[in-house]
A protein has these predicted regions:
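ER/Golgi luminal nucleotide-sugar-dependent glycosyltransferases, focusing on the catalytic module
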Residues: 1-186
């Protein structure tokens, strides 16, 4: 939590958390908290989701019930179109050295995803904003894949003894969300 003012009942600075990394991870600190404190310990809810302070998925209770009835795995926001492709988009928000660090982390940890990523970067669709509603197991699997990549990216991109205060991990997370769900779309 970046503020002492209480604005919600549940915060990302209790239990197992990375709340102090919020300046870089943005809303992904809340996803980490959900993964470690809800997805891994409770078996009550079938679906979990992440919205954040100014971004949310506009879905009604009836829509959620229909998702459950139709056994929908994942709900993502409409993808944003970036012409000519999403590789152009990331250069506005992400330093090339950080992008290269993420690609290196992918190659080290998940080489099959790294190979597919080059293909996905050439298409125009990006699922922005790190927003999702998904079945428990799918979201848990995504987190188990995502956070080791982000941790390794941080190790490769942050010079020793230097503290960063930008949103680069959050922006990289948007690209990784797109990769993960495009990779698993088939």
């Amino acid at each position: 939590a970046l503020t002492d003012q209480r604005i919600t009942e549940i915060t990302d600075d209790s239990g197992e958390n990375i709340s102090t990394k919020n300046v870089n991870y943005c809303e992904l600190t809340a996803l980490y908290w959900m993964w470690k404190n809800k997805l891994c310990v409770e078996e009550t809810d079938k679906y979990f989701g992440l919205f954040h302070y100014r971004r949310f998925l506009d879905i009604t209770d009836d829509g959620l019930m229909a998702m459950k009835a139709k056994n929908v795995d994942v709900l993502l926001p409409y993808p944003l179109l970036h012409e000519p492709d999403i590789s152009e988009h990331h250069s506005r928000y992400i330093e090339e050295s950080d992008w290269d660090a993420m690609l290196q982390a992918l190659k080290e940890l998940y080489p099959d995803y790294a190979e597919r990523f080059q293909e996905i970067l050439r298409q125009p669709y990006l699922y922005n904003y790190n927003m999702i509603i998904a079945k428990r197991e799918i979201l848990k699997d995504y987190c188990e894949w995502l956070f080791p990549i982000l941790k390794r990216t941080e190790e490769l991109s942050t010079p020793k003894g230097w503290e960063r205060a930008d949103r680069y991990i959050g922006y990289l997370g948007e690209n990784l969300l797109t990769l993960y769900f495009m990779y698993h779309a088939e």
